[in-house]
């Protein structure tokens, strides 16, 4: 598996704090390779803000190809209907590749976000590349939270793997959970499918190495490692 660098987790910790307090902020930039965790947190935001019968009316999604300062301003100006907040989502729009005039307009909009708005930029198919030298980056820093969903540390992953198996009515010990992570990689996005597959296959309540070997799909790096280590 690729080596893990020390990712900046401050944004992720702030988002978790906001979700726990049921008090979402006004601006989030969600990016990073751990898409399972990103989508989980995005869904948590939606559940908090869009719960109730008028959720559809309070959710505004802007396709990247339609994005402009004017289009964004129109969405931000939509008042919530029978709710406290609205959620505006923009996916795969490269803010920092916009023209200078547009960047300045976005910065102004970010600085003046209404209290009822939660604006979320999701980076899925394109990377997020901020430029700290720009006014736009300053506006994002002052008004919002940039959340990098990086690969999780092994200790946290082991706990998560065990929780996911328990949700399926199964149990797996810590050492075997670590072996599963080594075998299938340390991305939750990949592991969740393997966990569900193994859980469905296993006959007993306790997951065994035989269960994993029978149905898990090892990542290529692990196969090569085993061949060279043989």
Task: Give short role names for the model-derived ranges.
Residues 1-230:
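Conserved beta/loop motifs at nucleotide-recognition and modification sites
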